[in-house]
Amino acid sequence: MKSVTLRSVLSLALFFGTMPVLSAAPINDSKDAAKTPVAAGTAETEAAAAAAVQDDDPDKDVNRAQPDFTIVGLPTTLRLPKHKSAFRITHRFGRPLGEGDFSNLVEDFFGFDSGATIGFEYRYGLFKSTQVAVHRTNNRTIQFMVQREIKAQDESFPLSINVFGSAEGTNNFRDSYSPGLGVIVSHEFTDRAAVYAEPFWVNNTNPLPGELVDDNNSIMVGLGARLRLTAGLYGVFEVTPRVNGFDPGNHQMSFGIEKRAGGHSFQLNVSNAFGTTFGQMARGGTSDWYLGFNISRKFY
Protein backbone atom coordinates (compact mmCIF):
# COMPACT_ATOMS: atom_id res chain seq x y z
CA MET A 1 0.00 0.00 0.00
CA LYS A 2 2.81 2.38 0.94
CA SER A 3 4.70 1.52 -2.23
CA VAL A 4 1.62 2.27 -4.34
CA THR A 5 1.16 5.62 -2.61
CA LEU A 6 4.84 6.48 -3.06
CA ARG A 7 4.67 5.61 -6.74
CA SER A 8 1.57 7.82 -7.13
CA VAL A 9 3.27 10.78 -5.49
CA LEU A 10 6.36 10.38 -7.66
CA SER A 11 4.20 10.15 -10.79
CA LEU A 12 2.31 13.34 -9.91
CA ALA A 13 5.58 15.14 -9.17
CA LEU A 14 7.04 14.13 -12.52
CA PHE A 15 3.83 15.17 -14.30
CA PHE A 16 3.67 18.64 -12.79
CA GLY A 17 7.43 19.09 -13.14
CA THR A 18 7.25 18.68 -16.91
CA MET A 19 4.37 21.19 -17.36
CA PRO A 20 5.35 24.57 -18.91
CA VAL A 21 5.38 27.53 -16.58
CA LEU A 22 2.81 30.09 -17.74
CA SER A 23 3.91 33.73 -17.52
CA ALA A 24 1.55 36.14 -15.87
CA ALA A 25 2.69 38.93 -18.15
CA PRO A 26 0.74 39.39 -21.39
CA ILE A 27 2.45 38.54 -24.64
CA ASN A 28 3.05 41.66 -26.77
CA ASP A 29 2.55 41.50 -30.48
CA SER A 30 4.67 43.62 -32.84
CA LYS A 31 2.41 46.66 -32.50
CA ASP A 32 2.44 46.54 -28.71
CA ALA A 33 6.22 46.07 -28.66
CA ALA A 34 6.68 49.28 -30.58
CA LYS A 35 4.88 51.10 -27.79
CA THR A 36 7.24 49.97 -25.04
CA PRO A 37 9.60 52.59 -23.56
CA VAL A 38 12.71 50.92 -24.97
CA ALA A 39 11.28 50.72 -28.46
CA ALA A 40 10.04 54.30 -28.28
CA GLY A 41 13.50 55.48 -27.25
CA THR A 42 15.03 53.64 -30.17
CA ALA A 43 12.55 55.26 -32.54
CA GLU A 44 13.39 58.72 -31.20
CA THR A 45 17.11 58.04 -31.61
CA GLU A 46 16.62 56.94 -35.20
CA ALA A 47 14.50 60.03 -35.93
CA ALA A 48 17.19 62.30 -34.47
CA ALA A 49 19.85 60.57 -36.55
CA ALA A 50 17.74 61.01 -39.69
CA ALA A 51 17.27 64.70 -38.93
CA ALA A 52 21.02 65.11 -38.44
CA VAL A 53 21.66 63.52 -41.83
CA GLN A 54 19.15 65.88 -43.47
CA ASP A 55 20.83 68.88 -41.80
CA ASP A 56 24.31 67.79 -42.87
CA ASP A 57 25.20 70.55 -45.34
CA PRO A 58 28.69 70.16 -46.86
CA ASP A 59 28.85 73.95 -47.20
CA LYS A 60 29.16 74.11 -43.39
CA ASP A 61 32.40 72.12 -43.44
CA VAL A 62 35.63 74.05 -42.93
CA ASN A 63 37.41 74.73 -46.22
CA ARG A 64 41.08 74.86 -45.23
CA ALA A 65 42.16 76.24 -48.61
CA GLN A 66 39.52 78.99 -48.54
CA PRO A 67 38.66 79.87 -44.94
CA ASP A 68 37.10 83.26 -45.70
CA PHE A 69 34.87 85.03 -48.23
CA THR A 70 37.54 87.56 -49.25
CA ILE A 71 41.29 87.49 -49.83
CA VAL A 72 41.98 91.05 -48.64
CA GLY A 73 39.43 93.01 -50.65
CA LEU A 74 38.67 90.65 -53.53
CA PRO A 75 35.93 88.03 -53.07
CA THR A 76 36.60 84.28 -53.07
CA THR A 77 34.50 81.32 -54.22
CA LEU A 78 33.84 80.05 -50.69
CA ARG A 79 30.19 78.98 -50.47
CA LEU A 80 27.99 80.41 -47.73
CA PRO A 81 25.43 77.85 -46.46
CA LYS A 82 21.79 78.58 -47.12
CA HIS A 83 20.23 80.88 -44.49
CA LYS A 84 23.59 81.31 -42.70
CA SER A 85 25.52 84.54 -42.40
CA ALA A 86 28.92 86.14 -41.88
CA PHE A 87 30.17 89.53 -40.74
CA ARG A 88 33.38 91.39 -41.60
CA ILE A 89 35.09 94.56 -40.40
CA THR A 90 37.75 96.25 -42.56
CA HIS A 91 40.18 98.82 -41.20
CA ARG A 92 42.74 100.83 -43.20
CA PHE A 93 44.86 103.30 -41.21
CA GLY A 94 45.61 106.64 -42.85
CA ARG A 95 49.27 107.10 -41.91
CA PRO A 96 51.75 106.10 -44.65
CA LEU A 97 54.26 103.59 -43.30
CA GLY A 98 57.07 105.35 -45.17
CA GLU A 99 56.42 108.77 -43.66
CA GLY A 100 59.24 110.00 -41.41
CA ASP A 101 61.87 107.73 -39.91
CA PHE A 102 61.37 104.51 -37.97
CA SER A 103 61.23 106.25 -34.60
CA ASN A 104 58.34 108.41 -35.85
CA LEU A 105 56.59 105.27 -37.05
CA VAL A 106 57.00 103.63 -33.66
CA GLU A 107 55.73 106.75 -31.89
CA ASP A 108 52.61 106.61 -34.04
CA PHE A 109 52.39 102.87 -33.31
CA PHE A 110 52.74 101.98 -36.99
CA GLY A 111 49.73 104.09 -37.92
CA PHE A 112 47.31 102.94 -35.23
CA ASP A 113 47.19 106.49 -33.83
CA SER A 114 45.99 107.91 -37.14
CA GLY A 115 42.50 108.08 -38.57
CA ALA A 116 41.20 105.13 -40.54
CA THR A 117 38.85 104.09 -43.31
CA ILE A 118 36.49 101.55 -41.76
CA GLY A 119 34.01 99.21 -43.40
CA PHE A 120 31.29 96.88 -42.12
CA GLU A 121 29.98 94.00 -44.21
CA TYR A 122 27.13 91.57 -43.63
CA ARG A 123 26.80 88.51 -45.87
CA TYR A 124 23.83 86.12 -46.07
CA GLY A 125 23.24 82.79 -47.82
CA LEU A 126 20.02 83.52 -49.71
CA PHE A 127 19.82 80.19 -51.54
CA LYS A 128 22.16 77.25 -51.95
CA SER A 129 25.20 78.55 -53.86
CA THR A 130 23.81 82.11 -53.80
CA GLN A 131 24.89 84.78 -51.33
CA VAL A 132 24.17 88.48 -50.93
CA ALA A 133 26.17 91.13 -49.08
CA VAL A 134 25.98 94.75 -48.05
CA HIS A 135 29.15 96.72 -47.27
CA ARG A 136 29.28 100.24 -45.81
CA THR A 137 32.35 102.39 -45.25
CA ASN A 138 32.68 105.36 -42.94
CA ASN A 139 32.79 107.75 -45.91
CA ARG A 140 29.12 106.81 -46.40
CA THR A 141 29.64 104.59 -49.43
CA ILE A 142 27.29 101.59 -49.49
CA GLN A 143 27.78 98.59 -51.78
CA PHE A 144 25.24 95.85 -52.45
CA MET A 145 26.43 92.58 -53.97
CA VAL A 146 24.98 89.26 -55.11
CA GLN A 147 27.20 86.27 -55.92
CA ARG A 148 26.23 82.97 -57.55
CA GLU A 149 28.23 79.78 -58.02
CA ILE A 150 28.15 78.47 -61.58
CA LYS A 151 30.52 75.52 -61.25
CA ALA A 152 32.36 73.98 -58.30
CA GLN A 153 35.81 72.43 -58.48
CA ASP A 154 35.73 68.63 -58.38
CA GLU A 155 37.69 65.65 -59.69
CA SER A 156 36.37 66.17 -63.22
CA PHE A 157 36.73 69.98 -63.34
CA PRO A 158 39.74 71.85 -61.90
CA LEU A 159 38.11 75.25 -61.34
CA SER A 160 35.39 76.93 -59.31
CA ILE A 161 33.50 79.64 -61.18
CA ASN A 162 31.28 82.31 -59.62
CA VAL A 163 29.61 85.37 -61.11
CA PHE A 164 28.71 88.51 -59.19
CA GLY A 165 26.96 91.81 -59.62
CA SER A 166 27.29 94.89 -57.46
CA ALA A 167 25.93 98.39 -57.07
CA GLU A 168 27.42 101.06 -54.86
CA GLY A 169 26.59 104.66 -54.15
CA THR A 170 28.03 107.49 -52.11
CA ASN A 171 26.19 109.63 -49.54
CA ASN A 172 24.43 106.55 -48.14
CA PHE A 173 23.52 105.29 -51.62
CA ARG A 174 22.03 108.59 -52.79
CA ASP A 175 24.71 109.78 -55.25
CA SER A 176 27.41 108.63 -57.70
CA TYR A 177 26.15 105.13 -58.40
CA SER A 178 28.72 102.60 -59.64
CA PRO A 179 27.34 99.27 -60.91
CA GLY A 180 29.71 96.37 -61.48
CA LEU A 181 29.81 92.88 -62.99
CA GLY A 182 32.48 90.22 -62.65
CA VAL A 183 33.60 86.60 -62.65
CA ILE A 184 35.59 84.80 -59.94
CA VAL A 185 37.70 81.83 -61.05
CA SER A 186 39.62 79.86 -58.43
CA HIS A 187 41.65 76.70 -58.08
CA GLU A 188 42.42 74.92 -54.82
CA PHE A 189 45.65 72.96 -54.41
CA THR A 190 44.39 70.27 -51.99
CA ASP A 191 43.89 72.04 -48.65
CA ARG A 192 47.13 74.04 -48.81
CA ALA A 193 46.47 76.93 -51.18
CA ALA A 194 44.04 78.66 -53.51
CA VAL A 195 44.67 81.02 -56.44
CA TYR A 196 42.23 83.44 -58.06
CA ALA A 197 41.65 85.35 -61.29
CA GLU A 198 38.77 87.84 -61.21
CA PRO A 199 37.98 89.95 -64.29
CA PHE A 200 35.35 92.59 -63.56
CA TRP A 201 33.92 95.83 -64.90
CA VAL A 202 32.84 98.87 -62.89
CA ASN A 203 30.99 101.90 -64.21
CA ASN A 204 31.28 105.52 -63.02
CA THR A 205 34.73 105.16 -61.55
CA ASN A 206 35.95 108.62 -62.58
CA PRO A 207 35.09 111.08 -59.78
CA LEU A 208 35.19 114.12 -62.10
CA PRO A 209 31.92 115.66 -63.34
CA GLY A 210 30.40 113.85 -66.31
CA GLU A 211 31.03 116.69 -68.79
CA LEU A 212 34.77 116.49 -68.05
CA VAL A 213 35.06 112.73 -68.32
CA ASP A 214 36.32 110.93 -71.42
CA ASP A 215 36.29 107.46 -69.90
CA ASN A 216 34.06 106.57 -66.98
CA ASN A 217 34.50 102.79 -66.90
CA SER A 218 37.23 100.55 -65.55
CA ILE A 219 37.99 96.96 -66.50
CA MET A 220 40.23 95.10 -64.07
CA VAL A 221 41.61 91.61 -63.57
CA GLY A 222 42.04 90.90 -59.89
CA LEU A 223 44.72 88.32 -59.10
CA GLY A 224 45.16 86.76 -55.67
CA ALA A 225 46.37 83.82 -53.63
CA ARG A 226 46.05 82.35 -50.16
CA LEU A 227 48.66 79.91 -48.80
CA ARG A 228 48.16 77.89 -45.63
CA LEU A 229 51.40 78.04 -43.66
CA THR A 230 50.32 76.07 -40.57
CA ALA A 231 47.06 74.57 -39.34
CA GLY A 232 45.40 77.97 -38.90
CA LEU A 233 47.90 80.50 -40.28
CA TYR A 234 47.79 81.86 -43.85
CA GLY A 235 49.63 84.24 -46.10
CA VAL A 236 47.49 86.32 -48.51
CA PHE A 237 48.24 88.46 -51.55
CA GLU A 238 46.19 90.30 -54.17
CA VAL A 239 46.67 92.88 -56.92
CA THR A 240 44.03 94.57 -59.06
CA PRO A 241 45.52 95.83 -62.35
CA ARG A 242 43.29 97.95 -64.58
CA VAL A 243 43.50 96.70 -68.17
CA ASN A 244 41.16 99.19 -69.82
CA GLY A 245 39.30 102.42 -69.12
CA PHE A 246 39.87 104.88 -66.29
CA ASP A 247 43.12 103.91 -64.56
CA PRO A 248 44.74 106.70 -62.51
CA GLY A 249 47.57 106.16 -60.05
CA ASN A 250 48.94 102.73 -59.24
CA HIS A 251 47.19 99.40 -59.28
CA GLN A 252 45.82 98.49 -55.86
CA MET A 253 47.95 95.85 -54.13
CA SER A 254 47.69 94.18 -50.71
CA PHE A 255 49.40 91.42 -48.78
CA GLY A 256 49.13 90.14 -45.24
CA ILE A 257 49.08 87.39 -42.67
CA GLU A 258 45.87 85.76 -41.48
CA LYS A 259 44.97 83.67 -38.43
CA ARG A 260 41.87 81.47 -38.31
CA ALA A 261 40.38 80.30 -35.00
CA GLY A 262 37.08 78.45 -35.18
CA GLY A 263 34.58 80.69 -36.96
CA HIS A 264 36.79 83.76 -36.50
CA SER A 265 39.47 85.09 -38.80
CA PHE A 266 41.89 87.95 -38.08
CA GLN A 267 44.03 89.38 -40.87
CA LEU A 268 46.80 91.97 -40.57
CA ASN A 269 47.50 93.48 -43.98
CA VAL A 270 49.51 96.13 -45.78
CA SER A 271 48.03 97.92 -48.79
CA ASN A 272 48.76 100.88 -51.04
CA ALA A 273 45.10 101.99 -50.97
CA PHE A 274 42.08 102.28 -48.70
CA GLY A 275 39.45 100.91 -51.08
CA THR A 276 37.30 97.96 -50.00
CA THR A 277 34.45 98.29 -52.54
CA PHE A 278 34.79 97.52 -56.25
CA GLY A 279 34.41 101.16 -57.25
CA GLN A 280 37.06 102.23 -54.77
CA MET A 281 39.46 99.53 -55.95
CA ALA A 282 38.90 100.63 -59.55
CA ARG A 283 40.28 104.08 -58.70
CA GLY A 284 43.63 102.52 -57.85
CA GLY A 285 46.20 103.08 -55.17
CA THR A 286 49.05 105.40 -54.24
CA SER A 287 52.81 105.13 -53.99
CA ASP A 288 52.54 104.80 -50.18
CA TRP A 289 51.78 101.78 -48.03
CA TYR A 290 49.29 101.62 -45.17
CA LEU A 291 48.67 99.18 -42.36
CA GLY A 292 45.23 97.65 -41.93
CA PHE A 293 43.31 94.65 -40.72
CA ASN A 294 40.20 92.58 -41.42
CA ILE A 295 38.16 90.72 -38.81
CA SER A 296 35.50 88.26 -39.91
CA ARG A 297 33.05 85.97 -38.14
CA LYS A 298 30.93 83.12 -39.51
CA PHE A 299 27.60 82.41 -37.85
CA TYR A 300 27.38 78.66 -38.47
Positions of PLM-derived features:
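A compositional/structural signature marking long, glycine- and acidic/polar-rich segments
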Residues: 7, 228-239, 249, 287-289
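Bacterial N-terminal signal peptides
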Residues: 9-20
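Transmembrane beta-barrel domains of Gram-negative outer membranes and organellar outer membranes
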Residues: 25-172, 176-181, 186-193, 200-206, ...
